[in-house]
């Protein structure tokens, strides 16, 4: 009803997301994915007419200002499912017409012996 009447007042998160210059998200790897609250956030920002829309030919129309989304993930063990995590986030970028998607991860942080600081610094140098 709100969208049908062009009333987007209930979609503040989506409006904010659509208007930022660059997006950086850092989250732990939990249960083969990201935290559930981050999933809820993604669901709240996927709003037709704010963060994406289709033209009369079914082609996506760019609505999000950002040109880059960077996702940083850490994990205590191996990231055995990183391909599906990457794929989901890449598809969000495609939906939002964000042309550049950077995906950085550091895994095995709970495996000893392990110099966590050195591994994090090495990953940060890739930015």
Predicted segments, located by residue:
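Helix-loop-strand module that forms the ligand-binding subsite of alpha/beta enzymes
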Residues: 5-86
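Charged, glycine/proline-rich intrinsically disordered loops and linkers
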Residues: 1-3
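Glycine-rich phosphate/pyrophosphate-binding loop and the adjoining helix
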Residues: 83-127
């Amino acid at each position: 009803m709100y969208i049908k009447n062009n009333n987007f007042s209930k979609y503040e998160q989506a409006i904010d997301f659509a208007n930022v210059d660059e997006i950086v998200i850092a989250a732990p790897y939990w249960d083969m994915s990201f935290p559930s609250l981050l999933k809820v956030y993604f669901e709240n920002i996927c709003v037709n007419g704010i963060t994406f829309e289709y033209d009369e030919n079914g082609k996506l129309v760019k609505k999000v200002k950002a040109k880059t989304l960077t996702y940083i993930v850490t994990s205590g063990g191996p990231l055995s499912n990183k391909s599906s995590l990457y794929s989901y986030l890449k598809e969000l970028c495609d939906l939002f017409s964000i042309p550049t998607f950077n995906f950085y991860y550091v895994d095995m942080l709970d495996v000893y012996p392990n110099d966590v600081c050195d591994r994090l610094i090495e990953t940060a140098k890739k930015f």
